[in-house]
Amino acid sequence: MSANSLTSKLTWSRRFKDAAFRTSLTFSILAALGLILYIFYSLWRDSSFLLSSDLLTKFPSNDPDEVGFQSAIFGSLWVVGVAALVALPIGILTALYLEEFAGKRNRLTSAIETNIQNLAGVPAVVFGIIGLAFIARGPLSWGFTVGSAALVLAMMILPVVIIVAREAIRSVPPSYKDGALALGATPWQATYRVVLPNALPGIATGSILAVSRAMGESAPLLLLGALSFVTFNPTGLDSQYTIMPLTIFKYASDSREEFHYIAAAGSLILVAILFTLNLLAILLRDYTNRKNRV
């Protein structure tokens, strides 16, 4: 076999593998996109005739002509907002400590890292059981309130925030911090002024995605007494509440067909909220990238 023939066969083999890989990637992307578009279409088909401002301004009702999702929207925003206020600062500071100040790997940092990785894979319902035993009842006894639900969701998304923040901090070239230290900055100044701003796009994107996950959770909150029918908005951490997934489930399981269409409309509203959060993550990442380049 000549050298030219062997080279030709190797080139053809590489091209075939490259084409097969590109085709499989394209098919996977199109399949995922097609599934998402089909879900959107199904929700729109079943609920487009119901979409109006009344769904946002009215409270849940047993009358399909007077139904709305205001208390569910406000309840979700309260619970997820407070959870984010608790989890994001703690998660980012923990990531900074582990990556920038913990020093060489030791038993303490190894134990912390292992537990963080394990907690990230714990099912949501387990956090609900822990919250029921120690927060809603038990030592804290906060009851079935917004505060209990927010603290449980904060526990649930905290490992994700820490992992994402650590990856973002690792992506910053070490030379950036070394340059700041060489100019006389303290380790904290170099971290705060150089490392953190450059890691912020990744931290912000991952944090918002973690918050988006919390917005769609219902299993842990079922154990914490989240109601499915609430005709008032929460006013504080000690208020009772409902959330969008539970209200949607209530309408979807109703025997009357009208409420099935209302559930589809609620699902579309929830998807719109999640889409807005993801869009915010993209815009925030692009903004911080442009700001860092300037």
Language model features by range: what are they?
Residues 1-29, 281-294:
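Transmembrane alpha-helical segments of polytopic membrane transport and secretion proteins
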Residues 4-23, 43-83, 105-106, 250-261:
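Periplasmic/extracellular loop-to-transmembrane helix junction in inner-membrane transport proteins
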Residues 61-63, 67, 221-271:
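Interhelical loop and adjacent transmembrane-helix boundary motif
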Residues 83-116, 129-132, 137, 282-290:
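Transmembrane-helix boundary motif in ABC transporter permease subunits
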Residues 84, 164, 187-225:
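Transmembrane alpha-helices
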Residues 98, 166, 170, 174, ...:
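C-terminal transmembrane helix and the adjacent membrane-cytosol boundary/short C-terminal tail
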Residues 117-157:
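Generic hydrophobic transmembrane alpha-helix motif, especially the helices
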Residues 123, 183-184, 197:
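Glycine/proline-centered hinge or cleavage motifs at structural transition points of membrane proteins
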